Amino acid sequence: MKKAIKISALLIFFIGLTAMSVHRFYVGIYQVDFVPQKKRLEITTRIFMDDLNDALTKAYKKQTNIGDQKETPEDVTLMKKYLSDKFKIYLNGQLKTMNFHSHEQENNVIICYLTVKEVSKITKMEVENSILTELHDEQQNIIQFNNNGKKQNLLLSSSTTKGMLK
């Protein structure tokens, strides 16, 4: 009887561990730095590779392989389009064009490097970010903004895809 209880307790323990490892986090990190000497914003995005490929496949009805050896120039073009459609920055009330420079893979994360040019002064910045929100209701996109040493954070989600930083 004691042996059966011990086995049951161990079984419940291992099932609990397994359930915990299945749980996923749905978070993207977006670092936005104002570099006044260069009159630009420098943006670094960190998005989980599998989620990004799933979103691209869903949006464009084509299997993509961003971050994989099978990655094609067409995959990168679709990623650029997706970022442009889903991630927007308004400075002082005006929509700004983001320039995509490059991307790299670090473990299971895709890191993209973007800039916004011709930025002399920021009085307010509005961010619209709906990346991956079409896949996961739990998706959170964290915007970290550094404006001349003043740091601000903004948490966006599938229910709140826009926010203001001053």
Model-derived features: positions:
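Bacterial Sec-dependent N-terminal signal peptides
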Residues: 1-25
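N-terminal soluble domains immediately following signal/targeting peptides that reside
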Residues: 22-166
